[in-house]
Amino acid sequence: MKCAYFDANQCLSCRHLKTPLSDQVAAKTATLAALLKDLSVEQWLPPVVGPESGFRNKAKMVVLGAAHQPILGLVSPSGEAVSLCDCSLYPQDMQQLLHRLEAFVRQAGIPPYRVDKAKGELKFILLTRSQVRGEYMLRFVMRSEQAIPRIERELPRLLAEHPEIKVVSVNLQPVHMAILEGEEEIFLTEATRLEEEFNGVPLYIRPKSFFQTHPEVAAKLYLSARKWTRELAPTSIWDLFCGVGGFGLHCASKEVALTGIEIEAEAIACAKMSAETLGLDKVRFTALDSTSFASDSRGEEKPELIIVNPPRRGIGEALCHSLSEFAPKAILYSSCNPKTLAKDLHCISGYRVTKVQLFDMFPHTDHFEVLVMLQRIGE
């Protein structure tokens, strides 16, 4: 992949851009193998890769410059404000829309937030794309409600020009800190969610719902999870840190009892909607902390399979101990941080690692996703 930003030393996020993709994946595989070397992995499946450009479905743009000349991008290593609207990680239609949004901010006269002076209004523009429909969710992260009338004044023209924008909202983040978003979301459109689909499973995205950024690789990740689960044929599943339900809904069926737990209420609302669309009635999604749920469920009937898909910090010692105590037949662990994955796997007792597969969700970086199947010793 060629990148003028990287060549000009303006953006170095894709730090391994000059390394062939096959070599990147080989290095990631070696890193993972070294971390799991003490676990006697029974089967290493081939790594999964996808397009190295034009794949990303989410843009997080810092708004820089001034109201009359806004820049959507980042501050370069030299301190220069750089527009990233032409970033090759984004599909062409997203690049074009980002350019239009720079013009929108200028036409609306919204002053970008200045961190050094703690002045201004617009902090970030967050743009999310549904790959199945090519539709968008647009979020303006603002310091206050002061400039919302300016957005509302220009919005009808933007939506007329770009009917693919289905959801528009303002997120209020009043704190002078490096925090991406605040608690309050104000919708400026009737629609409040995007529709997405992977492998025939409908998923819904709301503003604060976590979603994978590489749709093609994510679809293959979900397929592997489904295949491995169906080989075990569990009758009951817990999906912890379930998000919008991607893993659990791929692994569920009308005969399987599925319980999904996620602390973010918006994501749970989306998961419930997907289950209803699929006609699954043995499903329960609840907004709770996953570790607390597991701890509070001791003494209750345990599932045959537990799926965990935690944030980068991993599942932690307390949940590792709960899983060891529950002793389900199998544990399916999806991780975006191999270091915390390795730490957690060493902490869970009574299991053997039967399958491991790497998914190159973040090309040109050191990051990747891993799917691991654990089966109880003796099963």
Curated annotation (Swiss-Prot):
[4Fe-4S] cluster binds at C3, C11, C14, C87. It catalyses: uridine(747) in 23S rRNA + S-adenosyl-L-methionine = 5-methyluridine(747) in 23S rRNA + S-adenosyl-L-homocysteine + H(+). Disulfide bonds: none annotated. It is an enzyme of class 2 (transferase). The keyword Methyltransferase applies. One of its GO terms (biological process) is rRNA base methylation. Catalyzes the formation of 5-methyl-uridine at position 747 (m5U747) in 23S rRNA. Belongs to the class I-like SAM-binding methyltransferase superfamily. RNA M5U methyltransferase family. RlmC subfamily. This is 23S rRNA (uracil(747)-C(5))-methyltransferase RlmC.
